[in-house]
Amino acid sequence: MEISERAAQLTPSLTLSIDSKAKAMKAEGIDVCGFGAGEPDFDTPEHIKTAAIAALQAGFTKYTPSAGIPELRQAIAEKLAADNGLTYRAGQVIVSNGAKHSCYNAILATCQPGDEVIIPAPYWVSYPDMVRLVGAEPVIVPTMERNNWKMRAEDFENAMTPRTKMLIMNSPCNPTGSVYTQEELEAIVEVARGEDIYILSDEIYEKLVYDDAKHVSIASLAKEAYDLTITVNGFSKSYAMTGWRLGYLAAPEAVAKAVDSIQSHTTANPSSFSQRGALAALKGDQQSVADMREEFDMRRNYMLDRLSKIPNVTAVKPQGAFYVLVNVSQLGLTSQNFADRLLSKSNVAVVPGAAFGDDRTIRLSYATSIDIIKKGLDRFQDFCRTL
């Protein structure tokens, strides 16, 4: 029996490959320092867990509306107004099984075979394959380290064709940690507005910004931006809720209705009791978010200081998320070879940049303890000296 062409063209995940090797080594008792984590190493705050437990004990375990419980959709609309300057009705908000699910729903609702979707690289690993799954074509726009790994408006414009249907933006960005300024986003919106192109704005890392960086929601920039933008966010990164699988999108009414219809025929509703936890996350004390950001900031600064002292590697200071993208091209290895050798020789797991569309780089996550960061960077430095 054959599988479908769409399934066959999906690329195996390099992130999962490295992760599985690292876990196998740990299972054998090997001391592996893992820098591959794409999730906070903190526990979900207690008041969120308590709300979900209370929902379970109260029997809130049945189906909910496919787009999410009304009170959560309303709370998200209120959050978007307060935090992001966005005016959405609850009916324009669709709750899903994670921000990843929301991204795919948005692409499926707006793109079709023959369409092109522009994606700046380095990119989050799943974007191109999501585009391929709906039969559209990803168009990759490389960015440069000297530009802080950010796509310029002219790069976007040069990549456009009559088939361009969507631009995917991720700020703060995984894997680069780049945060686009309002001026940079306004220039990009100006290009999209002239061609009536959707913008999928993945803002899952919005709460994790550092120094003087400010997160700006693209849809807040102008009415035209609002009309073109599908805003995606969730609870995984800000509230350490990766396993709860809850994300959401907010979009123009026609797109939101299409996504609701799609979701009703695929996954139906997100987990009922997880939604109650998410409601508590939005309504409750936000101190845990600030505490987590402060700890990440300390780790970020330590990691950057250590990396700056290693010859022949460079790293742009990330302004958001919890990753550092390290350029190792001067060391003479592909990113996959570098990651494989680093793991096998030094017991350090990193993600090769090839997974993100840039083979010059590797990604290090500081979503792990400072002790592991110190030990892992000692090994990383010793390994680089052997090349």
Where are these regions (language model features)?
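PLP-dependent class I/II
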Residues: 3, 7-13, 18, 25-33, ...
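Conserved N-terminal alpha-helix of the aminotransferase class I/II PLP-enzyme fold
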Residues: 63-96
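A glycine-/small-polar-enriched, mobile loop at the entrance of the PLP active site in fold-type I
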Residues: 36-39, 54-73
